[in-house]
Amino acid sequence: MKIFQWSILLVSFSFVSLSFAQKKEINATVYAQWKKNENQQISSNGRYISYEINPLFGDGFVYLYDTETAILDSFPRGKQAGFSFQSDYFVYKIVPGYDTLRTCELRKIDKKKWPKDSLGIIVLSTKNLQKLSDIKSFELGKEHNFLSYFKNSDELYKAIPVKKKWWKKSKKPVKAIQSDGTALTILEPISNFSKAWLHVTNCELSKNGTYATVTTHQKTKKDSYQLDVFAFAQQKTYQITQQQTAIPSVVFSDNQRHLAYLSSQDTSALKKYDLTLITLDSLTAKAANASKKIVLSDSLKTISMHQNPVFTLNGNLLYFGINDKQPILEKDTLLESEKAHLDIWHYKDLRIQPQQLVQLKQDEKRSELMVYYLHKDLIVPLSNDTLNVAIVKDLHADYLLGSVSYPYEIEYQWESAHRKDHYMVSLKDGSTKLLAKGVAFDGKLSPKGKHYTYFDSKSKKYIHLDPLTMNEMCLTCAQPSINWQSDINGMPMDADPFGIIGYSRNEDSVYIQSEKDVWIYSFVSQQLVCLTEELGARNQQEIALRLWENDSVFIDRSNVYFYGFDQLTKGFHLYDFDDKQGLKKLYSANSSFVQLLRSPNKKTLLFRQSTLEAYPEVMFTTNNFLSLQTISKTNPQQAGYNWATVELVKWKSYDGIPLEGLFYKPENYDATKKYPLILYYYELNSDNLFSHSAPKPTASIIHPTEYASAGYLVFIPDIRYTAKGPAKSAYNSIMSGVDYLLKTVPSVDSTRMGLQGQSWGGYQTAQLITMTNRFKAAMAGAPVSNMTSAYGGIRWGAGINRQFQYERTQSRIGKTLWEAPEKYIENSPLFNVPKIQTPL
């Protein structure tokens, strides 16, 4: 009997050992197995949650979870899912199979003949599923229960073929209407309401679904567009305009009293546009004054099609744009290749020529902002060719904030903080009032126009200005030890402030973010108080205010929660706030915070967190984190693979700076063995201790899980940059970390160490192998080898030069090439190539 028991025990141990030993290695062949959890949604009533799980290649699923019944449904090839406004039906797009589309592409089949998307509609009370074919796009209402969808084809129903008779009957064929539009349907599945149109190019529904606009198109000798309004209550269609050559924009006011649209009857390429205002009540009453064309007083200006009309939230004002009228060029007989094109360059240009060329189309579309008073029939100009004014929909005052950049634009070539002059712009008459000159970071004008606050980069303090009296005062001078600026890790530039969060509803206070806490300045008591009671500073947490909904221009404390990143553990804390009790901890974990959504009825929270080992699955709570339920399982196959473990290591650089780094080991790590070591680096990474690293293709960087799975140790040290320059700073940080590991981890094989970096990390790799020969091999992706030549290079995507990068930002030289040529040479790997012995 004992022999039998020992046999069972030995067999059990054998199975355990075999199971662990048989864990597979992660490599490029398994990328397709790993999936992503995407597009998480929560219904308005908080009962339903949906998400997608999609592989790198292949067909995914959309999932629907009922939090009351705990039933999880899945639907193959589902994408872009959403819930109706009233949470009574669920919609998702059904895409064709991956293999089907791949076959079509391989066989070079015309894309018009490829299988099309479908639409799945589920009535949640009955779980009945309806499928609609040939879907181009769909849209759900945010504050109404309608669903609108376009088909790819311009037909509602396919004609049923009629059986042919033996005799022929001559009949004049009906000429098919040619159109750029397709079939549109507006549907309400619960009430079974459905309305369809043909030849539709655009559809807009009003905020709560009282009206819908339908723009239709027919091709005749010229394009012919027609705009109609459908009133759901009357079940009637009202024609707004027809025989237009373009209707590029249609917009409802939020109060659903008015409609504005742009249109043109010109047949030329340079069209002149009209802006027309429709009073919807008058339209449905068939009143003669339902339509009003907005006329400009300046005959040299025209309505811009590049600035969509925007109503203010109260519906009293309408923003729109104007342009200079463009001359119509006379036709000629020259070929395009025979025409001369002239570019004029000047050394005093505010933008260099490559940047001008990149931004040419943007400049051509630039509009001057105007505002129209609906009840006064008054147009007020707000901006011009130098003054930029930001549109505010939720207006609470007669002022907007404007900015002028042209006095400083030429210095943008070498400065990273872009200075601007800030103005208060009157909505009543367009007059401007200078608030502050040379503001390097965004200032904030309060919604009611009582306060203007900005961060002064010279004094490193927040300054308040009373726009009425122009009196200034310092808001943060009472707290000189508080850090209001972000960590820029040695870049020779002005650091960004953490920012002005916003103003209270009655504008008696302003919320300001510091490095570790949230502060509130009272304009009544003229005192700066820490709203978070300096909990962040005491506990080494970076506590930040976050909004549940971005639906107000004010800070409402019932709409906030607080997130705290723990600088010591790299975990996080979530807090609620009570005016009497202050911060109240909701949840904390040694993991990485990924996502938090709240249902509109505030009953359900959707939550995601991760660690290196644990994928950020979809979780939910209905009791403020007293309990959490996990509902997704994205990558169960991970259990069969040799994964990685990670630990936070701490040491000091050669020049005494405290440093941190991430040290990864294989899951099956054996401390008695020797392992090769791979180093990867890019600025600061230790805060990513709990980030999940899933296998996937990369752009020339390494994934530590993949290398650890293959039997490597991976070290990702933080690099702290000092005035010694990027080369010496990187050397002191990286090599001191290597020495620390060799001293404390005997399993590191010092004869088999490698370097890997991409972009700025690639530069560090190229530079490091000119300074040491301790590494067996190195890989430098997209490095800069010669800073002297790169200094005047062009970033072709933006058209800007790289000068600022070396003088102010990541390259951290801090001087021009002529002021310190020795620094550019010292920090350029090219000039020390003869010293390199490491295979690269």
Task: Give residue spans per PLM region.
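Bacterial Sec-dependent N-terminal signal peptides
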Residues: 1-25, 784, 793, 801-804
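Beta-propeller folds
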Residues: 20-616, 620-621
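Conserved hydrophobic/aromatic pocket- or pore-lining residues that grip, position, or stack substrates
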Residues: 369, 618, 651, 661, ...
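C-terminal substrate/ligand-recognition segments
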Residues: 445-447, 454-455, 567, 608-612, ...
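N-terminal cap/lid segment of alpha/beta-hydrolase-fold proteins
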Residues: 632-673
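Short beta-strand element of the alpha/beta-hydrolase
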Residues: 673-684
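Serine-hydrolase catalytic-loop signature spanning alpha/beta hydrolases and amidase-signature enzymes
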Residues: 685-687, 714
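Active-site-proximal cap/loop segments of hydrolase catalytic domains
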Residues: 694-840
